Amino acid sequence: MNLQHHFLIAMPSLQDPRFKRSVIYVCEHNEDGAMGLVINKPVEQFTVETVLSKLKIMPQARDPAISLDKPVFAGGPLADDRGFILHTPRKGFGSSIQISPDTMITTSKDVLETLGTPEQPDDVLVALGYAGWEKGQLEQEVLENAWLTIEADTDILFHTPIASRWREAANRLGIDICSIANHAGHA
């Protein structure tokens, strides 16, 4: 099972406040473990503009038509002082990894310097921190019915309203997530 470029959709029974009703985009999944970003839990009163201001990044070619009043997400409980930028493919950043034909993740400052300019990637999601799993841990959580899985959809990732992402991701599986009982079993 390789869940890279998949969504993990928290089952209603998952009560950990860090992951309750969350959707996680899996950026990497291999024999050593997995890493992903929560894409539906914005940090309150923290925007992309706030991040750029705190880091003293003032792009020279700033386009006022491009809004920086976009949420920054609590990507997960690990390394929550580090930024992770999911975006549509654009080459030329110092530390980028292509996740799928439609998505990349960048952790270098140079991507931040393009935000709000004509040089920024078409779609961008900024997160602080990440969710991580040790070898076999994610697979076990899936077997224990903590998560539903589905191949990621960039429309949900970048364009679906934040409050609708959990329900919409489950809807893509044909499931009304709110009607699922809190405890599931295996047939």
Curated annotation (Swiss-Prot):
Belongs to the UPF0301 (AlgH) family. InterPro entries: AlgH-like. This is UPF0301 protein Spro_4027. PANTHER family: UNCHARACTERIZED PROTEIN YQGE, UPF0301 PROTEIN YQGE. Disulfide bonds: none annotated. HAMAP family: UPF0301. GO terms for cellular component: cytosol. It holds the Pfam family DUF179.
